Amino acid sequence: MASRILVNIKEEVTCPICLELLTEPLSLDCGHSFCQACITANHKESTLHQGERSCPLCRMSYPSENLRPNRHLANIVERLKEVMLSPEEGQKVDHCARHGEKLLLFCQQDGNVICWLCERSQEHRGHHTFLVEEVAEKYQGKLQVALEMMRQKQQDAEKLEADVREEQASWKIQIQNDKTNIMAEFKQLRDILDCEESKELQNLEKEEKNILKRLVQSESDMVLQTQSIRVLISDLERRLQGSVMELLQGVDDVIKRIEKVTLQKPKTFLNEKRRVFRAPDLKGMLQAFKELTEVQRYWAHVTLVPSHPSCTVISEDERQVRYQVPIHQPLVKVKYFYGVLGSLSITSGKHYWEVDVSNKRGWILGVCGSWKCNAKWNVLRPENYQPKNGYWVIGLRNTDNYSAFQDAVKYSDVQDGSRSVSSGPLIVPLFMTICPNRVGVFLDYEACTISFFNVTSNGFLIYKFSNCHFSYPVFPYFSPTTCELPMTLCSPSS
């Protein structure tokens, strides 16, 4: 019992850096204490690598003038040295705490040194026991090998810890350089590109925060790993430098703990997997933004005209439409859907409106020049969506197929050259760098053009119909297809 107390006291007055009893102890504000020589050497290393002084254990920063000599700890160390050198204390360690007899036997099952009375007790009955001299040499060798192994692991752990710190510093430099590059790219177009710059910087800062947070955690793990190894090494050295009794007391448990020690390597982050910043086409973005700003001056007030309530549902404010499965479903799978018109009848001038199509798998929108209330538009074969039939529209099909619908291509019959035959509508694939959540439609009646803009992507032009023939009023057109998510007319303030 007394021996255990001495061990506990020794651990409390051991320097965490050199793992020896404290010499001229100095205490920090955080409460940790170190040898004067050890903490002074640590000051120089911390200032050189990190530019600040921090506690080697808890990393709390502190000014050098706050180092305080700890006389109380120094006195405890001196008293402990006297007790450890006392022959009476050594005598106590060599005798059984329960029976007072000499500890001459080693119990293999319990891994402890016992006396002859312990051997005959019910607790150790049937156990294999040996003289301590017989097993001391065997465990001496095992512990020596374990000590060498742990020293090597300590070196490896310290190397891993240093690698993490080096990688952390490297990441900070790289991300800071990226910040500088991003801000330089947006400098000339600051007024227009503030939103883009802010978005890029937020993503980069999020990446920096995520990576550095993991690296800081990884560094903490490596520090704890190194400290645990140091504790084991200190225990091994104490056993090897102490008496035979100290060597063998609980030796099997120590060996088992050592055998379970496995170095955990820190997580690293590969440059190749980083999100690489690509500077946008600033000139193109500026031009697109100017065009979008120009056409938005002609923003028109548009609402939706209810039509075919069995297939579409229009909101009370008449600015949102969605597909509704018919109440009376036919036995045959429905392949038709209906669109709705906007309230604006256009016979002249310039007009602009925007439609929110966020998250929809399918939609068709644009301008309609003829409206047949009983017409059914086939979802799978949109033959009617052609300018010659009065439809200048673009759409999304199957989640990611963006298309514009042009007039059918005419060709001559092979058997009868005098007869002209039309194929299905010419479906023009549209390739989107950024999928539009919001589409702008601009109609210039006198110029006979209809333009579609990707408002989500700074107003880049999606598609433009030219040479349109308007011999009648035209209307905004909206079709939610068979996707039940809504299409919503946007207001200028939104």
Curated annotation (Swiss-Prot):
All residue ranges annotated as the B30.2/SPRY domain in the record: 280-494
Entry keyword set: Acetylation, Antiviral defense, Autophagy, Coiled coil, Cytoplasm, Immunity, Innate immunity, Metal-binding, Nucleus, Phosphoprotein, Transferase, Ubl conjugation, Ubl conjugation pathway, Zinc, Zinc-finger
GO CC field: nucleus; P-body
Modified residues (N-acetylalanine): 2
Reaction catalysed by this enzyme: S-ubiquitinyl-[E2 ubiquitin-conjugating enzyme]-L-cysteine + [acceptor protein]-L-lysine = [E2 ubiquitin-conjugating enzyme]-L-cysteine + N(6)-ubiquitinyl-[acceptor protein]-L-lysine
Pathway involvement of the protein, from the record: Protein modification; protein ubiquitination
Swiss-Prot/TrEMBL GO biological process terms: activation of innate immune response; autophagy; defense response to virus; innate immune response; positive regulation of canonical NF-kappaB signal transduction; positive regulation of MAPK cascade; positive regulation of NF-kappaB transcription factor activity; protein K63-linked ubiquitination
Record Pfam families: SPRY, zf-B_box, zf-RING_UBOX
Record PTM text: Degraded in a proteasome-independent fashion in the absence of viral infection but in a proteasome-dependent fashion following exposure to restriction sensitive virus.
Coiled-coil intervals, chain numbering: 132-223
Binding site for Zn(2+): 96, 99, 118, 124
Known partners and oligomeric status: Can form homodimers and homotrimers. In addition to lower-order dimerization, also exhibits a higher-order multimerization and both low- and high-order multimerizations are essential for its restriction activity. Interacts with BTBD1 and BTBD2. Interacts with PSMC4, PSMC5, PSMD7 and HSPA8/HSC70. Interacts (via B30.2/SPRY domain) with HSPA1A/B. Interacts with PSMC2, MAP3K7/TAK1, TAB2 and TAB3. Interacts with SQSTM1. Interacts with TRIM6 and TRIM34. Interacts with ULK1 (phosphorylated form), GABARAP, GABARAPL1, GABARAPL2, MAP1LC3A, MAP1LC3C and BECN1.
Protein function: Capsid-specific restriction factor that prevents infection from non-host-adapted retroviruses. Blocks viral replication early in the life cycle, after viral entry but before reverse transcription. In addition to acting as a capsid-specific restriction factor, also acts as a pattern recognition receptor that activates innate immune signaling in response to the retroviral capsid lattice.
Name this polypeptide is given: Tripartite motif-containing protein 5
Species of provenance: Cebuella pygmaea
Recorded name of the encoding gene: TRIM5
